[in-house]
Amino acid sequence: DFPNIVLIMTDNQPAEAVGCYGNNEIYTPNLDALAADGVRFNNAYCPNAMCSPSRASVWSGRMPCQHGVHTWLNDKLMDQWPEDWNAIAEFDTLPEILNRNGYATAMIGKYHLGKLDKPQNGIDHWITMSRGHTLDFYGNEMIVNGDTFIHDGHSVDFFSEKAVDYIDGRTNSPDQPFLLMLPYNGPYGHWPAILGPAKNQFWDRYADMPMTSIPREGLNERAIDAFQLAMEWLHQGKEGPNFYSLLQLPNNLTSLRNYYSQVSVIDHGVGQVMNALKENGFDDNTIVIYTADHGFSLGHHGFWGHGQATWPSNAYRIAYNIPLLMWGAGISGKQSSSSFVSSTDIYATLLDRLGLWEDLEKQNIPSRNFTGLLIGDDDNWTDEVFIEQEETRAIRTPAWSYFKRFGGSETYPLKNELYDLINDPDERADLSGQKEHQDKERELSDKIDIFFNTYANPKFDLWN
């Protein structure tokens, strides 16, 4: 039988912002229970540390240089988009493939890949917000299968309630498998959404938390460089990102506590979803996946936010290492895996579980099938992941992290970076350009070139 699939994705959450990844301050009992009974991946990475590109990669199994989404989609430009436009319309997405094969498909949460008023990408049941970014968790305009209204309460609670309603309703069609995409719009991590004390039910737990799980660091000079670049754009009459808050947020204890409380709101919702699956008898034939669109620095390395929060873009672990928990049908539980996987690999792995990957595998798709890892077999797995963030491409292995920078700009000469993760796991001592490491640097650089030469689509390859 085809299993039901629940794919939960959060917005801006590093792996270490979950209790089961070793954080003893954050309250995530439901996620910890999911990890205890399922598989926890310790080295899961996103291909790009921005919302829209990473989501496009999970939905399509492709890298940004293949699907063409390289940064977040700007809500302010939405009126200029063609009717019914979405950024990955030409690709066979996970919900479209499952829909063709008899699945009921639902998307409840943040989309951020195109127009929002109508269902996209093979989705039958469509519930989302009327914007991609979260300015406030309360009072958001919601779209429920074409009906638009303001929801006064917390948006994460709203999406959780609608997910439970959807699961309850599936008992009317028990023989039809379903795919539920549940991309929450939290914890988010930007002002004004996390400015000041939180209004949610978990704030009291964190109001006086010392937040020792977050390092206290001075501002990274590259975060300041990014701010200065944004100011140059503004002086030229261009609209650049608002980096003022990104320089104010590091070490802001109130916002850090607010952020943690939003993670707990999500955890509460995950508990509701798991209870709904069990109460309706779906738990024996359902796969549940919990992950994030990308990681997020909460002041680590002296910057706040994504890979693009510095100039040039960085590829530090904190911005790319994501939680990945899998539980359910066909998965050997109570284990953790240290194998290196990418969120693009979810695509191939789920399709293989359904017997639908063989034909797609012949296409030029970098998504890797990690089914073996779900039953504890890692004998034939290659421990490396590839990352791209516009002017930065990177490879991570258990021993090394290498950032390769675009070399075609005379205005901004960019430096490569090499880190020895065995002796320098926090990526502090850049070894690039040193004679004793030149062979390793050349080896990793060649691997990056081979990977992107293999998979990049010339239409969408920013480096060529």
Roles of regions detected by a PLM:
Residues 5-11, 98, 110, 143, ...:
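A short aromatic-rich beta-strand->coil structural motif
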Residues 119-122, 127-129, 190-198, 275-332, ...:
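Histidine-centered active-site microenvironments of extracellular/periplasmic hydrolases
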Residues 7-10, 14-106, 117, 121, ...:
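Active-site segment of extracytoplasmic enzymes that catalyze sulfate/phosphate-ester chemistry
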Residues 2-16, 33-34, 58, 98, ...:
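Beta-strand elements within well-structured catalytic alpha/beta cores of enzymes
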Residues 70-100, 112-260, 409, 413-414:
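Formylglycine-dependent
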